[in-house]
Amino acid sequence: DEQQVKTVFEEVNPSVVIHCGAMSKPDECELDQPAALLNNVRGTELMLKYASVNQPHFIYLSTDFVFDGTKAMHKEEEEPLPVNFYGHTKLLGEKAVQQYAATWAVVRTVLVYGNPLGGRDNILTLTRKKLENKELFKVVNDQQRTPTFIEDLSAGIIAIVQRRATGIYHLCGKEMMTPFDMAFATAKYLQLDVSLLEKVTNNSFKEIAKRPLLSGFNISKAEKE
């Protein structure tokens, strides 16, 4: 809602904007592409439009899904190539942010996990729920990524705010893991029954949107700065 966006910027007059809102479920984006464009691209453009009045530092949260999954440890300067519509819309959002007249930063991250604080479930919370209910949990074991602990991501964003850092930044963990690896580690830590975890391949699920099989970022730029 453009009027709502306009009103918020006029009333709050922020010095920093952290734009993390998105339609972020790949299958939903694939099924309803107009809605994905409206939320992920048009929504971003509207925020940039009204931010440009007083020009706060603009931070945009993006994703490893802007890459095609043929290699890992991507650096910020590498050319994106999304393989699904969600990644496509996030890349369009990135490009819009890069045209912003004031200072901006794009923060790409990977498979965020931790306490959802009322948000949607992640691999850790799903593992706990399934295994505490004694349910079999089928978890993909042929997608490799560098998962991101939510508190590490938050600390990275705070550093960008404090330093008013600009440009593209990759913020994620250092260790390559599959979703199954994460679920197994969670179950072991919580002393839950790991025998309820079943390794499956990406093709086991009838997912509409293609997922990158190999992902993850080189975070040396963020570490240095």
Which residue ranges define each predicted feature?
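Catalytic helix-loop patch of NAD(P)-dependent Rossmann-fold dehydrogenases
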Residues: L31, L38, R42-L46, V66-V107, ...
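Mid/C-terminal beta-alpha module of Rossmann-like enzyme folds, strongest
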Residues: G156, R163-A209, L213-L214
